[in-house]
Design a protein with these regions (language model features):
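Glycan-recognition and catalytic cores of secretory/periplasmic carbohydrate-active enzymes
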Residues: 1-328
Length: 328
């Protein structure tokens, strides 16, 4: 496992935003730009201390969310694309802008975007579970009362859906699953919310038990997901699952100092490097890109290298790398 840089991130980024998809290793301009990618890219730019890139992504978010309705996609010629609005994307923008604010990156501009264009929609956004988790992560950094309120809402959803064999707030494990325990863990870590910490840890242990039970890491795939009483999908594994699982385990380690969480986080990072069902790395060291995921044979590792993958990987890498090097 090596530490990669921002070469592919820079390749995908222009003065307008970050291109959403590639065809092989070339930008697929037919797919344009997406708001959620810009939000995740902002997280990464802040973590990498790249104010030049952060400025691009903040600008994209600003032009997308300060109009009605929110623009979730743009075409290659930089025109709004009439595609469905995403509550998750807007909530991810809140999280990313909060991270920028907490790191003194264009603080006044980011606060203005939140106050004028996202804060008025928070009570609408919180009705979606993952959107609520993204909001919780952002609020944990800049709005303690809101963070505690959102955490209590997540906890109530968890309690309502809880089963002894399924300690999870939904009956199915879907997309970006680890963001749910991560949100609770961060509220517990930053604000001393004991129930949030304990429940987040319980949920994370459940998820780790599913994904890390074999010699290689098996993420919940999108070719069927994993519903209670069924079996986890083995294919359609996506980098965002591994990356967010790194973040959740780093947070759990910060709270408990239990080395098992650091080991688990390292294994999720190693999924990118070959601790997966193919035994092969999905990272291209030459251009510092990350493949779109792992599909069923004979397709296997995707040949495409879109934005979501590289921004999620880099953010997770930078969160856990100092801890791994310190313990090596």
């Amino acid at each position: 496992m090596k530490r990669i840089g921002a070469k592919h991130l820079e390749y995908l980024t222009d003065d307008f935003g970050i291109w959403q998809h590639t065809d092989g290793n070339q930008i697929d301009r037919t797919q344009g730009y997406a708001l959620d990618d810009a939000a995740r890219a902002l997280l990464t730019a802040v973590e990498l201390i790249r104010p030049d890139l952060a400025d691009v992504y903040i600008g994209f978010i600003e032009r997308s969310v300060t109009v009605q309705p929110t623009i979730n996609f743009y075409t290659a010629d930089r025109q709004p694309w009439d595609r469905p609005w995403s509550p998750d994307a807007l909530a991810e923008c809140y999280w990313a802008l909060a991270v920028a604010i907490s790191n003194d990156v264009q603080e006044s501009r980011c606060r203005r975007i939140i106050e004028t264009s996202i804060a008025p929609k928070i009570y609408e956004l919180r009705e979606w579970l993952r959107a609520s988790a993204y909001l919780t992560l952002g609020a944990a950094l800049i709005d303690q009362p809101l963070a505690l309120e959102l955490a209590d809402q997540l906890l109530e959803t968890y309690r309502t859906n809880y089963h002894t064999d399924w300690p999870w707030p939904e009956d199915t494990l879907y997309y970006a699953n680890a963001i749910l325990p991560y949100a609770l863990l961060e509220v517990g870590r930053l604000h001393g919310h004991v129930e949030a910490s304990q429940t987040g840890e319980r949920m994370l242990k459940f998820l780790n038990g599913i994904c890390l039970r074999d010699r290689e890491v098996h993420l919940i795939g999108n070719e069927g997901w994993y519903s209670r009483g069924g079996l986890p999908a083995r294919y359609g594994e996506q980098p965002i699952e591994a990356a967010y699982s790194v973040l959740a385990n780093v947070s759990a380690y910060a709270i408990t100092r239990n080395e098992e969480y650091l080991e688990a986080g390292g294994r999720y990072l190693n999924w990118f490097w070959g601790e997966n069902s193919t035994g092969e790395s999905i990272i291209n060291l030459q251009n510092e890109s990350v493949a779109d995921g792992i599909d069923a044979p004979p397709r296997g590792i995707s040949q495409n290298q879109g934005a979501e993958n590289i921004v999620c990987y880099l953010y997770a890498q930078e969160q856990i790398w100092p801890l791994l090097k310190r313990n090596s």
